């Protein structure tokens, strides 16, 4: 009666409203069942010290049948779930009574070895003898079962073998397919040229030089020319060689010709920096490709792909050295036939954390147009940071004794003095000498997290010096806040 009264009062169609209520009840029921399933899975994994977040990730992949699936083969966790290692899957398997010589264990171990070494060293394959030696050592089994497992994985198509003369190269199918598809796409693009007269390009360069009050070197001008003439281009060079100047010139020249330009970089920080120096919006590659919830066979789903390509005439990717082969596969998938791809980076800088050393391999292949910048410009020559970067690259020792420049070395015999020395540099010496603000204009980089000079300890010390608590400050310490739905990216909080 209550529903009928409400329906008549609101002038709604009765049958339609009942259908809405029915759908709502079904949605509530599905959500309830899902939460029950998640709770059971979290409790199941809790005894193996698997975090709730990882357990939820497992549920999203395998659904309500997760527990029997894992009990039947725990190694699917290492094979298919990012964040769950082979060691953890092996621990679960041993507790469930799996044998050390079982095929599923050895096969999963082999795949994890290829993944791990690929991520560490930038490889996409390993020599067969290397895999066998690593597997025998890690799994503590004899060579015969390992060779049998490799043969079965090759027959099933999970691994791919290519003869390299002295040895067989063994790939995960994922890496093999990605590398092949990227290579084929880039080679096709390298054969595409755009019919535009060099004198027309030079006129555009002259106009940009005049407006921006800059003067390009001949090598830089050639890079801009090739950006107009070819569909795939690499621009590489060390620090201070003018890569950013070229990017800006290409952007402004392309805009004069009414070309739609997009900028992207592998990380949020690199994209932010690119935006700042170019005065033009840059996105992370994941954001550019419109990453969506869920995973596919290569770990992520993107709305932009071969069926829904990026709508641009020119795509410029900075910090290409950090792009791995899987991300590159997604990126090239999303390029339309009209899009020029300009890859900018220094192959001697930070490599990707994933498999593949994409930029270096592209340069070494000599299959893609590549402009190498070697001249260090006047302003960069005055920086000992740039000079020493090139010295190290050339196998020379850095110059450490110029305390009047922007690169100097501070020696301490006692490691316990290091935190206070770093704090003194940030609070007193650098701000006084260079006129910098200790909070907004100085960064401290450290390779560790938990040591004496690690992130956690230094942050505590620097906060107490640079931003100490005060009754005058409108702040209080509370529980951590989790952002679940905001346009906030990693390291921006």
Please tell me what each predicted stretch does.
Residues 347-482:
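Conserved helicase motor core of P-loop NTPases
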Residues 105-124:
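Positively charged, polyanion-binding regions of nucleic-acid-associated proteins
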Residues 221-224, 229-403:
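ASCE P-loop NTPase helicase motor core
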Residues 1-5, 16-24, 242, 484-492:
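Conserved small/polar residues in nucleotide/adenosyl-binding loops
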Residues 1, 15-28, 45-59, 76-93:
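Helix-hairpin-helix
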Residues 122-135:
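Short acidic, hydrophobic short linear motifs in intrinsically disordered regions
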